[in-house]
C-alpha cells in the first residue's frame, strides 16, 4: 500500500492513483513488489529536523528515505521537502511536476537498491530516474 500524507504543507497536486501505479511499475522493473510505502510531504524546516534527529546531518535536502525493505518487498517512509523540490525545479529549469515526480521515484529507486553517493553512482541514479519518468505522462 502507498499512502500520501502531509506535515505542515498543502498536499501537492498529484494524481495519486496514476502515481501509485507508476511506482509499482517501476518497482517491478527491478524485480520488486510494493509493501508499505508512506510519502510524507513536508517543509524545509521539517526535513531539516528529520535530517538532524535521525541522520545527524545538518542540512536541507529534497528527500530522506527510511528503508524498511524485506526481500523483494520494498517498504519505507519517504520525507519530501516541497520547498526544496520547488527551488530545485527553478534552479534546474524544470517544471515543478516533473521535479516532484523525479524526487518521488528517487526514493523508490533507493529502496530498489540504487545508490547515488559513490563514484559513478549519481549518473546511474539519474539514468534510472529518466527511464522511470519516461513511463509517466506529466
Curated annotation (Swiss-Prot):
GO cellular component: cytoplasm
Signal peptide: none
GO molecular function: metalloendopeptidase activity; RNA endonuclease activity; zinc ion binding
Record keyword rRNA processing present: yes
GO biological process: rRNA processing
EC number of this enzyme: 3.1.-.-
Subcellular location(s) per record: Cytoplasm
Class of this enzyme: hydrolase
Protein biosynthesis among keywords: no
Gene3D superfamilies named in the record: Metalloproteases ('zincins'), catalytic domain
Keywords attached to this entry: Cytoplasm, Endonuclease, Hydrolase, Metal-binding, Nuclease, Ribosome biogenesis, rRNA processing, Zinc
InterPro entries: MetalPrtase_cat_dom_sf_prd (IPR023091), YbeY (IPR002036)
Cofactor: Zn(2+)
Co-factor note (free text): Binds 1 zinc ion.
Residues annotated as binding Zn(2+): 106, 110, 116
Family: Belongs to the endoribonuclease YbeY family.
Stated role: Single strand-specific metallo-endoribonuclease involved in late-stage 70S ribosome quality control and in maturation of the 3' terminus of the 16S rRNA.
Protein name in UniProt: Endoribonuclease YbeY
Organism annotation: Phocaeicola vulgatus (strain ATCC 8482 / DSM 1447 / JCM 5826 / CCUG 4940 / NBRC 14291 / NCTC 11154) (Bacteroides vulgatus)
The gene coding this protein: ybeY
Amino acid at each position: 500500500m502507498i499512502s500520501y500524507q502531509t506535515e505542515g504543507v498543502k498536499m501537492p497536486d498529484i494524481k495519486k492513483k496514476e502515481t501509485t501505479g507508476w511506482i509499482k511499475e517501476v518497482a517491478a522493473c527491478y524485480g520488486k513488489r510494493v509493501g508499505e510505502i508512506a510519502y510524507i510531504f513536508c517543509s524545509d524546516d521539517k526535513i531539516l529536523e528529520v535530517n538532524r534527529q535521525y541522520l545527524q546531518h545538518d542540512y536541507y535536502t529534497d528527500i530522506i528515505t527510511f528503508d524498511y525493505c524485506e526481500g523483494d518487498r520494498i517498504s519505507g517512509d519517504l520525507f519530501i521537502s516541497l520547498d526544496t523540490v520547488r527551488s530545485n525545479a527553478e534552479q534546474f529549469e524544470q517544471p515543478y511536476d516533473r521535479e516532484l515526480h523525479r524526487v518521488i521515484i528517487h526514493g523508490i529507486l533507493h529502496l530498489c537498491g540504487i545508490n547515488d553517493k559513490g563514484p559513478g553512482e549519481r549518473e546511474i541514479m539519474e539514468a534510472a530516474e529518466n527511464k522511470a519518468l519516461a513511463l509517466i505522462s506529466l
